[in-house]
């Protein structure tokens, strides 16, 4: 069974790019634009990795990450923050919020794929 990545991203173009890159690398994707749905989807699908946009309309991606990490059944799933925040201190704040890794937008495609594979291995 292929490994899966849940993408939590409200921007349609970013969602399509991330989905295309991840699926082209041989992984399955579960997608939502709504941070409030992320917890239920994670429980239902048990993804191997979660890509989390930090700036979501309903609730911050860091808040969603906190909920995931507070859940005994989901806390083991690595969360990679994908965000336009690129100021000094942002990466540290994001890692302290529970994210295992951080990718800044606009993404570097090779680095994006390399980061995904570092958590999932080859598909």
Swiss-Prot record:
SUPFAM superfamilies: CheY-like
Biological process (GO), any one: phosphorelay signal transduction system
Localization annotation: Cytoplasm
Keyword annotations: Cytoplasm, DNA-binding, Phosphoprotein, Transcription, Transcription regulation, Two-component regulatory system
UniProt xrefs under PROSITE patterns: RESPONSE_REGULATORY
InterPro entries associated with the record: Bact_response_regulator, CheY-like_superfamily, Sig_transdc_resp-reg_receiver
Chain positions with 4-aspartylphosphate modification: 53
Highest taxon listed in the record's lineage: Bacteria
Gene3D superfamilies in alphabetical order: 3.40.50.2300
Molecular function, one GO term: DNA binding
Response regulatory domain location: 4-120
Transmembrane regions: none
Any one Pfam family match given in the protein's UniProt record, by short name: Response_reg
A Gene Ontology term for the protein's cellular component: cytoplasm
Task performed by this protein: Essential protein that is involved in the control of cell division, probably through the regulation of ctrA. Its phosphorylation status is regulated by PdhS.
Assembly with partners or alone: Interacts with DivL, PleC, DivJ and PdhS.
The protein's name: Polar-differentiation response regulator DivK
Organism: Brucella anthropi (strain ATCC 49188 / DSM 6882 / CCUG 24695 / JCM 21032 / LMG 3331 / NBRC 15819 / NCTC 12168 / Alc 37)
